[in-house]
Amino acid sequence: MILAPISAIYGLCRATSLTLLSVFTLHQGCASARVLGRDGVQRMAANEAVEVMNWTHQPAWLAPDDREIWMDRCVQQINWDQPQVRVYGRWHRVPRLTAFLADQQVAYRYSGAVHRGEGWPDWFRPLLDLVSSRSSAPFNGCLFNLYRDGQDRMGWHADDEPEIDASFPIASLSLGSSRDLQFRHRVSGARCDVSLADGDLLLMDPDCQRLWMHGLPVRKRVKQARLNLTFRVFRSVD
C-alpha cells in the first residue's frame, strides 16, 4: 500500500476562456472548455455553466469551505493504493493513487484488479447523499483518483465496464488544482477539452461513454494535487 503525501495547501487555478468548433451544437454554452477540430479551427464563446454534448459541467458546484473540508478528509482518511498494470509483458505502477468505496454487494474490475465494496464510512455519507441527490441517481460506488501533481495522468478510456449500470449518469467531482479533462469522439475523432477546477461537478449522461473516450493528460506546470471522485451505479453481485 502506497500512501499519498499530505499537503496543507492545495493550489487552485481556473481557466476562463472557451473556444468552440462551429460544427458542434452547444445547448447553453460550455464552461472553460476548448473544442478543437482536425483542422485546428477554433471559435470563442462566453464562459457559462451548462450542458454541452453528452455531459453537463457545473463550475463551483461545491461551496468553497466544503471543498477544503472534503479534500482534507479524503486525502487523510482513505487508504490510497498505487496498483500495477501489465503493459507489453512488463509491470508498471499507474501514474496516480487510487481507492474505491462501495456497497458490500459491489465488485469492480479496475487497473487489473477486482475491487470489492466494504460499505461506506460514516464520514463520507453526507457527500455521497449530496451528489446522488444532485444527479438523481442511486450511486452505490465511488472511484477515487488522486493526481499528486501535473505528472500524474490518466490515458484514453471510457467508463463502460460491464459492472457499471449504463442506464444512469456518472458524476465526477473535482477537488484541488485545475486540470483539463479531454474528450475524443469515437467516430469523428473531434476533441473537447474541459477545464475542471476546485469544486466543479461534471455529469456524464449514459450516452457519453458510448460516444466519447476521455483522459487526463500530463500538465507539467501543475505542482499541486487534484482529487477526482467518480460516482457510479454498479450492478450488485450476490
Report the location of each language-model feature.
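Short N-terminal alpha-helical targeting/association segments
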Residues: 1-2, 11, 19
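Non-heme Fe(II) oxygenase metal-center motifs and adjacent flexible, charged/small-residue loops
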Residues: 20, 24, 35-238
